[in-house]
C-alpha cells in the first residue's frame, strides 16, 4: 500500500499523540523516531501477513535460515526506503522543521551480530524478501550483543552494548508461542512392546520466548521475518524465596537468562564453553520446534516436510538442529530411524565459512554428553551409522573413516555431522568452494561429490549504494537510467562510460564530497582532523591475525621511517583508516590494536610527517559507521593470506562504491578481479598453491626478513619502540612463527603500495579503475545469491 503525504502525516501525528501525548511540533527526536519505527514496523507486519497468506495459498516451499548472529545495523532508513516511504516521511518531517537524518541518528545499531557472518545473514533476509522467496531467519535476542569497544591508551576495553532500550521498538514478543528447552539430567531409553520410549530425569528447563523483527523487500511484496529467541526461567522459585533462600531463587532465574545475554561469550574456560553450547542448542531446538509446529498446523503431517521446508545452517553453530530434528521425529512422532534421517537429509543444507580444517568447530564429548544427554545418544547412533556407511565406501581405510567420523578423539565434530547429513554443502566463493573440495572436506567430496556447491556471497547493495551514497546513485541515474535499482546487473551499462571525461569528473566530484562529509563527521564525533584530499586507504574487518592488519601496520611504519629519512620525497598524503574489534580473549589481536593506535599517535605528534601520513582507528566500528565510510573509501585493503579467507563481503561494498581493491587473490577478491579486470585492482602476494608449497617445505620467516633491509628496519623499530613502549609480542610472533606468512608477502605488499601511489597520481587512470569496479559490482548482489540458493540448493520458487 502506498501512502500520500497527508495520510502518512496523519499516521505519525496520531501515533505521537497516542503513544507520547505530544504534537509533532513538541515531540523530541527520540519520540519521533520511536513512533516512526512503530508505524514502519506495523506496515511491515501487515505486509508480511499478506505475503505469508499467499505463500500458504500457493503451497510454496519455505526457507528457514539459522545463524548465530544477524548484524542488522539500523532498520528505519532501509525499511522506509524499501517500502518506498522515505521521501514522504522526509517531506512530512520537513514541514515540522525536522531533518530526517536527525531521526535516523536516534536509532542504535541492533546488537545481534559481530562480523561478516552476521552481516551476510542480514543481507540475505533482504534478498529473500526482494526476490519473493518465503524466508525466516532464526537467532537469539541478545540483551547486550557483542560489546561496545573503547580504546584507552591503545588498549581495547569492552563495555556492555545496551542496545535494547532504543531497539526494542522493532521487536514484538510472542510469549504464547514459547518453547520449553531441556538441558542436563539423564535420558533413559526403554523398549516396551516393540516401541521405543525416552524418559528425561533431573533436567533443567529454559523457556525460549520468540520475538519478531521484519525486513521488507525492495519493489516487492515480500517481507522476511527474523525470529529471535529470548531465554527465560520457567517460573520464579517462590518456595525458595519465601524460605529466605533469596540467592537460590534468583540464581536459577539468572542462570536460565544468561543464555541470551551476550553473543559469543569468552570460551577460554569450561564455563564459557558450556554456555556457548547451551546457546547453540537453545536457539536451534526452539527453531526446529517452531518450524515443525508451523508445518503441522498447515499440513497435519511431517511426511511432506522435505517438499515444503528448506533449512539452511549458516556455519556450524546451529548444527545441533540436525540431531534435534531427529529427536522429535524419533521420540515424539515415532518415525523409524531411517525415515527420520532421510527427512533430515533432504531438509538440511550447510554453508561452510572456514578454509582451515583445524578451525572447524568441535565439542568436548564430556561437555556435550552432560549438557545434552538425549542429543548425545542420537549423535552416537549417527556416528555408528556414519562409520558403517563410510566402511562401505572406503573398505579397509580405517584412517579415513576415523577422520570423517562424527565422534573422534573425545570430540563431537559438528562439521562432520553437517557433511554426513546435509544434501548440500556450499562454499561462499569460487576459490573457497574449491578449497573445501580439495582439502577441508576432501574425503566427503569423494564420498558424495554431488552435494558440493558454490554460492558466492552477496550484499544488500541498495543499502550500501542507494541509501548510503546518494551522490553516486544520482550520477548513475543520470548516466544509465534507474534500472539498476531493481536489477544490479544493470550497473554493467556504466562500463561504456568509464573513459568518458564528463562521467569521470562527476564521479571524482562525488567521491571528494563523500570524503569531505566523512572528514566532517569524524571531526564532530571524535575531534580527529583528516585531509579529504589524502588517499583514504581502509581496512575495516574483525581484528585477527589471518586478516593481517599487522601487515598493513608494518607498511605504515616503513612509510613513516622513509618519510623521516627523506623529508622532501614525493609522497601523496595518505590516511589509513582501521575499524575492528578483537574477541575479548584474543590477546594477540589486542596487541595488534595497541600497535596500530600507538603508531598513529606517534605520527600525529610528529610535525615532520603528520601532513603526509595519518592513522585513524574507528572506535566501536559498526554497520551505521560503515555506511558513512564506504562511499568515502578509495582503497579497499583485502590482504589476508591466499587460501585463508572464505569470501568476504566488505570487499564487495567497497567495490560497489568505487574503491580499488588492494589485495591478495583470496576469497571473493578473485571474482572481483575477474569481474572488473585484474588490471583494475592492485594485486600482490603469493597464490594459494605457492602458500601450500611453502608450508610443505617448512616456512621460516627469517629467510624473508634477513634479505630485506626494510623488513629488518621496521621490526627493529617496533621492538625498540618509543615513549617506553614496544611491541615485542607482535614482532616476536612474526620472527619466530608468523602463522599467516606476513613476512613472506611483506616485500610484494610494499611494491603494491608503491604502485598505488603511482596510479593515484594518474587521475584519469584511477577514475577509469574506479568506474570499472562500480560497473562490474552487480554480480555481488544478495538478490543474485538468494536466487542461486533457491535454484541450486533449496528448490524454492518466488511467490507470484
At which residue positions do the language-model features occur?
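A conserved ligand/cofactor-binding region detector
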Residues: 1-800
